[in-house]
Amino acid sequence: FALAHMVNDFDIMKSYLDEGANGIETDITFSPEGEPESAFHGVPCDCKRWCDRTVSFDSYLQKTSDLSTPGHPDYRENLLIIILDLKLNGLSQDALANGGRRLADKLAAHFWTVGRRDQRATFVVSVPQTSQKVFMKTFREGMEAIGMGDMNAKVGFDFTDNGDVSVTKAVYDELGITEHIWASDGITNCVALLFRGTSRLEELIQKRDEGESTYISKVYAWTYDKETSVVLALELGVDGVMTNYADFVISILNKPEHSSKYRLATYEDDPFERFKAV
């Protein structure tokens, strides 16, 4: 997956989809009460990016629903996965709980109501810290409560705190989440990968490959903008690369030395199916 980073308005969304990105990551802000409000990152953000792009969350959902619905004039077949990078830090536990329910309500309203279930996008609900696990809990409960439990097939989960892998697994076990788990490791593009290292990324890939007992479906790295970093990630066996330059990542993927082992995912590929590194 070539995952376009910080896709927070429609102009940049079009640009990345034109480049061939098959996934987008969007920052979602919340009110103090836990109501999803807008796609917005703000400063600071990645180097060489405009931090203040924004649209309302409802407008964002309507647009991405149109883009992922076959037969709609705006349909884009390469939009496969939408990572919702949820800006939850600072919210109380009550607000987190409300936020999970409200996100379920909004996704259902825009994507899975009667007559709209043919849309093709899959979501990753990306929570910053394991201490905010109640958000995932109430999201899943909310989906069941509104009769959308079957649509959990289109939803995955991710914690982005670069935390201890065993602790993260214990939290998923507590939540009863045993599949559809995307695991990520990364750092802003303003810091060289040399300083971050890849030891945790390699640990995630190893856990993914351990067998049927593992809890990880996919592993992605962020935010990789340099060829050396992208090549290293591919050689390690990641499932996705999040980047500010989707066309650049795709061009690397298409080089002969990589295209014999990897290709860009399509709709026929299950975003939650586990593939081992070779």
Curated annotation (Swiss-Prot):
GO annotations of cellular component type: extracellular region
Active-site residues, record numbering mapped to chain: H5, H41
Domain of life: Eukaryota
Cofactor, how bound (note): Binds 1 Mg(2+) ion per subunit.
Cofactors (names): Mg(2+)
Location(s) in or outside the cell: Secreted
A GO molecular-function annotation: phosphoric diester hydrolase activity
Disulfide linkage: C45-C51, C47-C190
Protein's UniProt keywords contain Transmembrane: no
Keywords, comma-separated and alphabetical: Cytolysis, Dermonecrotic toxin, Disulfide bond, Hemolysis, Lipid degradation, Lipid metabolism, Lyase, Magnesium, Metal-binding, Secreted, Toxin
Tissues in which the protein is found: Expressed by the venom gland.
Residues annotated for Mg(2+) binding in this entry: E25, D27, D85
Annotated catalysed reactions: an N-(acyl)-sphingosylphosphocholine = an N-(acyl)-sphingosyl-1,3-cyclic phosphate + choline; an N-(acyl)-sphingosylphosphoethanolamine = an N-(acyl)-sphingosyl-1,3-cyclic phosphate + ethanolamine; a 1-acyl-sn-glycero-3-phosphocholine = a 1-acyl-sn-glycero-2,3-cyclic phosphate + choline; a 1-acyl-sn-glycero-3-phosphoethanolamine = a 1-acyl-sn-glycero-2,3-cyclic phosphate + ethanolamine
UniProt family annotation: Belongs to the arthropod phospholipase D family. Class II subfamily.
Function as written in the Swiss-Prot or TrEMBL entry: Dermonecrotic toxins cleave the phosphodiester linkage between the phosphate and headgroup of certain phospholipids (sphingolipid and lysolipid substrates), forming an alcohol (often choline) and a cyclic phosphate. This toxin acts on sphingomyelin (SM). It may also act on ceramide phosphoethanolamine (CPE), lysophosphatidylcholine (LPC) and lysophosphatidylethanolamine (LPE), but not on lysophosphatidylserine (LPS), and lysophosphatidylglycerol (LPG). It acts by transphosphatidylation, releasing exclusively cyclic phosphate products as second products.
Protein name, per record: Dermonecrotic toxin LspiSicTox-betaIE2iii
Organism: Loxosceles spinulosa (Recluse spider)
Taxonomic lineage from the root: Eukaryota, Metazoa, Ecdysozoa, Arthropoda, Chelicerata
